[in-house]
């Protein structure tokens, strides 16, 4: 499978995107097609039955200019791995039954079932089976089962693909020599290169390589041996992306057309409107150009000038509309260009017909013929001006994305010789992992990494939304795209290119434009039938008024003062107004422009929103479920003290045990593990000891079990909660945690099967957690907390943030979190639940919830499972929950703006089309085509300007007032649902055991 990304120019509304989508999906070999009207990008997935060039031709056949930005192969994932819970197994026979039955499923490659953890790990081929099939098979065996995790299996995360442009082209070689060209690259296969592919046009080389063995600069250096020169084709070509987002070409095109058509329109208006109205004697006295020509009777100089000017505008500036209209009609669809083309052609053709008719049948009184060249020119002029303003406004909707792209520098300085401290400047595309990069004051940081030398203050507003300089020193992480302050430092790169956090943010924002809100489906449907419907209405309008004039003894005032020819003209003019006043673009732009601005504002304030569907989901959320550690609390846990069991009688070296504890905890990335490691690092006694982990097992929901060796001694180490440290062992030891401060987390340690002691660990609540939770409650949301921590710790945090104890669940496993989320969803019939977590052990619950919200810190984003990612910093000041309030406010206001845009677009068409059809003609009110064109041009502009109003968004004051004024104050449906709603009450029993080294106390 391959994926091609194309830039498509000339799309104006959803009818254009629907036309392209329909044609591409009908093409054999195309499996997926996504089009963004705002970013002008088309992303197509296809197989070997079609080529990128043929896809480009299809788009061009639809009447749009198109260029290929990137064409690359998609790495196929042959297998996936999944994790299922299996409840009810009692012995090895149960394990054997489950293993045998699941292994018998076609496509399953490996099955491992654990009786202790009650889990089943499956590796399977997604092309042949699914994890759901395995779950059903387990349940058929008589056991309860749930899917915990379903992710990639053998996808090699170290494998990278690079596309190189050949500057010394292969076509210079003869076919005989060309066959040996491929052989020149074979030596690369021994250096870490997985595959080499030469493009059909011989201009590009696609290489897959292992980035652990080979860097991009190393690859280019080896390629020099072939005798050819290469440059890296960057997927993040900033210049191309910025050019597309700024719409420079479109702005330039419509600006030129607007100037030309407006200048000529002014001349035509002088000839046909202003002079006859202001100085009628000039027309009556037949002063030039209102004088009849001497060589053709009935032909006036005014009309010669008019037909020349109108023909130029109609077939020069208007050629764009003809081309687009013909392309859409070829595929059985219509766009706004079709309506413009039909209306201007009607006015132009009528004028030419009147001119020719007057030449063959001149008036005996020398009366000037009825000519409306000014109408066709003015319509094109108004539309061109409207398009120019609309494109300008649309370019402003993507400023947030443009600013993020601009944060990536084009070059950077790396240490080329460590001993001599020599630096060299390289393009950012050539940056490799583990490079040492020099950052001077004011420079942009090119990659994610860790500071190795020096210190500074850095602007990380792309993460937090606040331009507060964050102090950084040796060992602190830095993020690509952040801007250095006054200091000078060096850092080692950890992720580069498309794997950086900035690249992920840009990717999420761009993909958000491809995700349509369900409400947009209605707009797309209306747009698909809009043009045919308007043309039918225009024809009906013409014939109905002609019929009324023929049978009516008392025609409307607009017709009584005119001849039959004039009445025919008014009927035609009325029908033309119907065609030109209709505006499908307003409907098509209502949703995507608001989504682009809303997601851009969110990104600027540390909130990543994954498209329109997420925005619509947020509008129906009634309940928020919080994780505790890392979400309501800072996640920076600290060991307050270590209590050794007074009954311990084992003959072991305590320093060696602490060294083994540190080595064991190094396996996990859990906040509790990090706290214990820091505590062990602070003890001088074990710094000289080097413990080696021989075996280890992470027991989900309970802790870690390992076998360690230090100084030739072997220890069986077990660290975790009471469920892991067998209750019998605790009872035998007589060791209880009565001396532990209530509200702290407890992690027990056993050595060689006997309880050794416990760690008492504390985690502080975030400084704005209380204000955020109260903000939600003030605005009618139900709040819950589900944690794997013990009862006392859960109560302490709930008390501090203001969550009712009846809505708090403790000692809950990841699977248990899913069960509780389902339980809360089922309350009151249709409860919509948003889960807020930090991504550690939360992925299943985030995926199961109606809306998953991940709190992201550090340099990794929990993007996959969450619908919304809230970015925050690592330090206590920027590690904030306030972003949740921002996410709610932005999402609700953006969705409200979408509905307002659609309401305005529908009201405009519903109101203006009947007026254009002549419902007010009995009262002498008509809508001339020129005014209709002006109204239509500015209707779409007004929708874009409405979306741009979202840029004025300011963060809500969570300390005082909330969002009820725009969420539901004026919603009748919400009023009645709240009036008869009841408060959700927690169940009597919590679900037990959660991942993470926690003690297992009484259930709330």
From Swiss-Prot:
Annotated residues for binding of Cu(+) 2: 91, 94
Residues holding Mg(2+): 838, 842
Database matches in Pfam families: E1-E2_ATPase (PF00122), HMA (PF00403), Hydrolase (PF00702)
PANTHER family xrefs: ATP7, ISOFORM B, P-TYPE CU(+) TRANSPORTER
Family that this chain belongs to: Belongs to the cation transport ATPase (P-type) (TC 3.A.3) family. Type IB subfamily.
Oligomer and partners: Interacts with the copper chaperone ATX1 via the copper anion.
The protein's name: Copper-transporting ATPase
Originating gene: CCC2
């Amino acid at each position: 499978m391959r994926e091609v990304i194309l830039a498509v120019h000339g799309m104006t509304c959803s009818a254009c995107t629907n036309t392209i989508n329909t044609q591409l999906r009908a093409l054999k070999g195309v499996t997926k097609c996504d089009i963004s009207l705002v970013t002008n990008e088309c992303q197509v997935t296809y197989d070997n039955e079609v080529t990128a060039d043929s896809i480009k031709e299809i788009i061009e056949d639809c009447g749009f200019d198109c260029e290929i930005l990137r064409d690359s192969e998609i790495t196929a994932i042959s297998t996936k791995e999944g994790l299922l819970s299996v409840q009810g197994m009692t012995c090895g026979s149960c394990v054997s039954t489950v293993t045998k039955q699941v292994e018998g499923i076609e496509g399953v490659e490996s099955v491992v079932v654990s009786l202790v953890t009650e889990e089943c790990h499956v590796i399977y081929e997604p092309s042949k089976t699914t994890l759901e099939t395995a779950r059903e098979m387990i349940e058929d065996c008589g056991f309860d089962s749930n899917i915990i995790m379903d992710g990639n299996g053998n996808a090699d995360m170290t494998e990278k693909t690079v596309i190189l442009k050949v500057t010394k082209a292969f076509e210079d070689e003869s076919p005989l020599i060309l066959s040996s060209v491929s052989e020149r690259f074979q030596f690369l296969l021994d250096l870490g290169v997985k595959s080499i592919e030469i493009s059909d046009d011989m201009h590009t080389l696609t290489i897959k390589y292992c980035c652990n063995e080979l860097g991009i600069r190393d690859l280019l250096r080896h390629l020099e041996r072939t005798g050819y020169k290469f440059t890296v084709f960057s997927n993040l070509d900033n210049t191309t992306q910025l050019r597309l987002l700024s719409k420079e070409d479109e702005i330039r095109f419509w600006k030129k057309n607007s100037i030309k058509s407006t200048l000529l329109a002014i001349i035509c208006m002088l000839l046909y409107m202003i002079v006859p109205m202001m100085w009628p004697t000039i027309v009556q006295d037949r002063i030039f150009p209102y004088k009849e020509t001497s060589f053709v009777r009935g032909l006036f100089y005014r009309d010669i000038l008019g037909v020349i000017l109108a023909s130029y505008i109609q077939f020069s500036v208007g050629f764009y509309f003809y081309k687009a209209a013909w392309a859409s009609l070829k595929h059985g669809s219509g766009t706004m260009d079709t309506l413009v083309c039909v209306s201007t052609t009607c006015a132009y053709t009528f004028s030419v017909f009147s001119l020719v008719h007057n030449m063959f049948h001149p008036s005996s009184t020398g009366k000037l013929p009825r000519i409306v060249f000014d109408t066709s020119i003015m319509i094109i002029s108004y539309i061109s001006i409207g398009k120019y303003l609309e494109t300008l406004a649309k370019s402003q909707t993507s400023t947030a994305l443009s600013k993020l792209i601009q944060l990536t520098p084009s070059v950077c300085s790396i240490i080329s010789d460590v001993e001599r401290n020599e630096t060299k400047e390289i393009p950012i595309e050539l940056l490799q992992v583990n490079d040492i990069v020099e950052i001077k004051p004011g420079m942009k940081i090119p990659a994610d990494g860790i500071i190795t030398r020096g210190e500074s203050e850095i602007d990380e507003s792309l993460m937090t939304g606040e331009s507060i300089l964050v102090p950084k020193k040796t060992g602190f992480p830095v993020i690509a795209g952040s801007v250095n302050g006054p200091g000078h430092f060096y850092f080692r790169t950890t992720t580069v290119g498309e794997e950086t956090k900035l690249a992920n943010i840009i990717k999420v924002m761009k993909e958000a434009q491809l995700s349509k809100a369900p409400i947009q489906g209605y707009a797309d449907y209306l747009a698909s039938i809009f043009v045919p419907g308007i043309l039918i209405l225009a024809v009906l309008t013409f014939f109905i008024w002609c019929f009324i004039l023929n049978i009516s003894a008392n025609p409307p005032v607009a017709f009584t003062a005119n001849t039959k020819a004039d009445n025919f003209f008014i009927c035609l003019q009325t029908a033309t107004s119907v065609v030109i006043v209709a505006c499908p673009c307003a409907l098509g732009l209502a949703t995507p422009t608001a989504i682009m601005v809303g997601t851009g504002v969110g990104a600027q304030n540390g909130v990543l929103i994954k498209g329109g569907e997420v925005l619509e989901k947020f509008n129906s959320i009634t309940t928020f479920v919080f994780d505790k550690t890392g979400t309501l609390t800072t996640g920076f846990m600290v060991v307050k003290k270590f209590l050794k069991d007074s009954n311990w009688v084992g003959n072991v070296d305590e320093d060696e045990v602490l060294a083994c504890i540190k080595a064991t905890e190094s396996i996990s990335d859990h906040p509790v593990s990090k706290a214990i490691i820091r505590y062990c690092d602070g003890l001088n006694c074990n710094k000289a000891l080097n413990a080696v982990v021989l075996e280890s097992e992470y027991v989900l929901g309970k802790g870690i079990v390992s076998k360690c060796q230090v100084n030739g001694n072997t220890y069986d180490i077990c660290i975790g909660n009471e469920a892991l440290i067998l209750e019998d062992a605790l009872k035998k030891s007589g060791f209880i945690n009565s001396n532990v401060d209530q509200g702290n987390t407890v992690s027990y340690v056993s050595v060689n099967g006997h309880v050794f002691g416990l760690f008492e660990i504390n985690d502080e609540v975030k400084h704005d957690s209380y204000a955020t939770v109260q903000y939600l409650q003030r605005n009618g949301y139900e709040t819950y907390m589900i944690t794997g921590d013990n009862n006392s710790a859960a109560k302490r945090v709930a008390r501090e943030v203001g969550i009712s104890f009846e809505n708090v669940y403790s000692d809950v496993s990841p699977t248990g979190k899913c069960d509780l989320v389902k339980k809360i969803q089922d309350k009151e019939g249709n409860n919509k639940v948003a889960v807020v977590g930090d991504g550690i052990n939360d992925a299943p619950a985030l995926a199961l919830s109606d809306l998953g919200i991940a709190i992201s810190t550090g340099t990794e984003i929990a993007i996959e499972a969450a619908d919304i990612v809230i970015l925050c910093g690592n330090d206590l000041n920027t590690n904030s929950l306030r972003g949740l309030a921002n996410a709610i406010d932005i999402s609700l206001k953006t969705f409200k703006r979408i509905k307002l845009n659609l309401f305005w677009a529908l009201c405009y068409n519903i109101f203006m089309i009947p007026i254009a059809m002549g419902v007010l003609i009995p009262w002498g009110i008509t809508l001339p085509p020129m005014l209709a064109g002006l109204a239509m041009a500015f209707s779409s502009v007004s929708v874009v300007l409405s979306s741009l109003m979202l840029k004025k968004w300011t963060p809500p004051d969570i300390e005082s007032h909330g969002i009820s004024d725009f969420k539901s104050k004026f919603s009748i449906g919400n009023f009645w649902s709240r009036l008869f709603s009841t408060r959700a009450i927690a169940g009597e029993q919590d679900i037990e055991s959660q991942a993470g080294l926690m003690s297992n106390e009484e259930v709330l």
